[in-house]
């Protein structure tokens, strides 16, 4: 373990076996529901949209909806074809197809909320031939068409490794492409059945290979060869959770894998058990250890790292990307 990491047990503790355990002081938040919270909820309900804030029981919903007036929209329905052990989203076989009105409804919500940075995620849709890639592209295009100044961040599933799915979403020009690694390789079978560590890492690596920062793309003077792979502008991002039973050494190895894949932006947060049916919390990670993980990530070369007990994938997402100009 890196010398920069605090020793396990120094300020952290594990919940009692068989219980959800009492949360430590650093995870207790004050609940408030200002008017902006109700405005966001009314808008989401009116347009019949889903948000990961609600479906995944995000602890930051009151901060994002109430204080910042932001939300992460979840497209492609509210039923996921996979059953991850940490996720509160309903799993099963989706009964509905893709809503053709959803792209415009999401764009309307983004415009009404005045978002400068919109985050779009989805359930897994393994029942669709392209995993939902084309629908992602349509949502991105609808937002850009309606509000050109808004940056779009997408948090996608792995599309089951379907060929060309990545190009479909990247061709729609999202400002940020994100796919979460979630946890260390050893815990994938219990935490992410249906997903593979190597497949997720390969998706990030391929996206990083295709994506080029805007400045780099603009200054490239090399001629483009016939049949060359397309390259796009944008940034690449991922996130992991801790507290599922991983060891700090495994976290450091995973961070090295992620950075080696070319990822620039990283989030690290505490796993919170959504219901007693989900995986138990193995331990509560102390804020000092989160700070140490962040320091290690920056030393590896990540451009940005949000690391803390309540950090989630889209937490302060707008702060990681330079605002678009009108």
Residue ranges and their predicted role:
Residues 1-71, 104, 108, 138-149, ...:
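Auxiliary Fe-S-binding modules of radical SAM enzymes
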Residues 52-64, 78-91:
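Local cysteine-cluster metal-coordination motifs and their immediate loop/turn environment
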Residues 54, 75-76, 121, 155, ...:
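A secondary-structure boundary/capping signal
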Residues 83, 128, 187, 276, ...:
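Glycine/Thr-rich phosphate-binding loops of Rossmann-like dinucleotide-binding domains
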Residues 88-106, 111-208, 237, 265-267:
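Core AdoMet radical
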């Amino acid at each position: 373990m890196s010398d920069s990491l605090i020793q396990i047990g120094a300020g952290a503790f594990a919940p009692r076996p068989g219980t959800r355990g009492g949360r430590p002081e650093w995870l207790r938040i004050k609940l408030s529901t200002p008017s902006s919270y109700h405005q966001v909820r009314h808008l989401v309900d009116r347009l019949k949209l889903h948000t990961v804030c609600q479906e995944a029981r995000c602890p930051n919903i009151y901060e994002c909806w109430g204080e910042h007036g932001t939300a992460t929209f979840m497209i492609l329905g509210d039923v996921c074809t996979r059953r991850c052990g940490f996720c509160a989203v309903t799993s099963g076989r989706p009964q509905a197809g893709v809503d053709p009105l959803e792209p415009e409804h999401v764009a309307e919500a983004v415009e009404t909320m005045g978002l400068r940075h919109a985050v779009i995620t989805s359930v897994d849709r393994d029942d669709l031939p392209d995993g939902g890639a084309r629908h992602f592209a349509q949502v991105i295009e609808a937002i850009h068409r309606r509000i050109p100044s808004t940056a779009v961040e997408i948090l996608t599933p792995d599309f089951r490794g379907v060929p060309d799915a990545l190009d479909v979403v990247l061709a729609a020009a999202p400002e940020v492409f994100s796919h979460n690694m979630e946890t260390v390789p050893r815990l994938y079978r219990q935490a992410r059945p249906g997903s593979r560590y190597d497949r997720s890492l390969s998706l990030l690596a391929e996206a990083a290979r295709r994506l080029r920062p805007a400045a780099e793309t603009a200054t490239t003077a090399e001629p483009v060869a016939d049949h060359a792979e397309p390259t796009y502008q944008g940034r690449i991002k991922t996130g992991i959770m801790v507290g599922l039973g991983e060891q700090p050494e495994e976290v450091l190895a995973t961070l090295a894998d992620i950075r080696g894949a070319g990822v620039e932006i990283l989030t690290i947060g505490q796993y919170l058990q959504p219901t007693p049916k989900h995986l138990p919390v193995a331990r509560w990670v102390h804020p000092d250890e989160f700070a140490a993980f962040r320091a290690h990530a920056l030393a590896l070369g990540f451009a940005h790292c949000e690391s803390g007990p309540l950090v989630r994938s889209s937490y302060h997402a707008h702060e990681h990307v330079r605002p678009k100009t009108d």
